[in-house]
């Protein structure tokens, strides 16, 4: 009789826990259903009659006390069983108190179940490494430990158990399952040398102009939060839903160029990616947008003078073999527009002007360039000028602070000498006389 009771308990421990049609009453064997001696089953160890039952149920995430024992081996080898166990575990997580230890343990159990499910998947179902969609170029990420958030569904990406992609153009991150739900093209397609900023401060048009829908995904929104909260982007002035606007902060270009205001404002995800890609693009012509800004920001005047001097130094380096070998102009490789013009600025330039870093770094580069031309290189020294007005022996260069340059012939003079002589250039006068003499000589020959 004792052997039969052990045998009944053993069979109960090895019943399929996913068969919900069998209730607990159905599991109990009737006296007429006693097992015959033909079934040869191993004898349970004495003192632990119910150990296997609780461990098996615990491993599948279906036991009544999910947290009495640590996670053991997963005995289920069927994909369907694991998926059902995952659904059961998810339901348990929702029923448990928030931030409780039991809920955290259940989340760990859910991760293990999903890992087991991932191992059982067919290897032929692997995702491709590159996906191209709406001008996005998505690459499959290999990092398993970095915690990210999906830009489409606004949920956490679990790198250990989920396949996820990142766009190389705009850094858009999403689950593999969310790729086909993306409706907006990559913002990098709008970013080019001809791209422009919105230079009106928060150009709001109202929710009615958007038909009370999100400007990006067209989901219904309202200022009252029903059905979804409307969040305004300070860059575009439009309203977005909470999935497209995460209250990210960014510096607004319009507020910088008009008010010299660098306080970050809330922007949508799309605007944040666009501003991040545009931050180093030199597309702001400050003297046309707001010429009065140079009257109120002294650092901008200093930066403009340094840039003008560097442009005057550039011809020396282009014709100097030593400067080309030393690659001096590469000191400004991060700001190539500084050796092309003195008018264009990027938001990154203005940010560093505001923080006081650009003036210091540009002064160091200016000093390095001037040292090469005036002290280190004899060829560059030979290209200097002597003031033709005072005939003094010091060598002048167009980027010296005490000099003036003729706009017509580019001759260099002392500033005081040039203005004392009513800005009359002797070199231009000499060239004019030479031209006149050349025109007069053919006429004299014809008269003769």
Swiss-Prot record:
UniProt superkingdom: Eukaryota
Expression tissues: Abundantly expressed in peripheral blood leukocytes. Highly expressed in B-cells. Also present in lymph node and appendix. Down-regulated upon macrophage/granulocyte differentiation. Weakly expressed in bone marrow and spleen. Weakly or not expressed in thymus and fetal liver.
Statement: the UniProt record of this protein carries the keyword Cell cycle: no
Keywords noted in UniProt: Metal-binding, Phosphoprotein, Repeat, Zinc, Zinc-finger
Entry's Gene Ontology BP terms: lysosome localization; positive regulation of bone resorption; positive regulation of ruffle assembly
Compositionally biased intervals (Basic and acidic residues): 25-37
Transmembrane region(s): none
Location of the region described as Disordered in the Swiss-Prot/TrEMBL record: 18-46
GO molecular function, one term: zinc ion binding
SUPFAM superfamilies recorded: Cysteine-rich domain
Residues bearing PTM Phosphoserine: 437
Phorbol-ester/DAG-type zinc finger span: 135-186, 365-425
InterPro entries cross-referenced by the UniProt entry: C1-like_sf, DEF8, DEF8_C1, PE/DAG-bd, RH_dom
Main function: Positively regulates lysosome peripheral distribution and ruffled border formation in osteoclasts. Involved in bone resorption.
Assembly and binders: Interacts (via C-terminus) with PLEKHM1; this interaction is weak but increased in a RAB7A-dependent manner.
Family per similarity comment: Belongs to the DEF8 family.
Protein name: Differentially expressed in FDCP 8
Source organism per UniProt: Mus musculus (Mouse)
Gene from which this protein is expressed: Def8
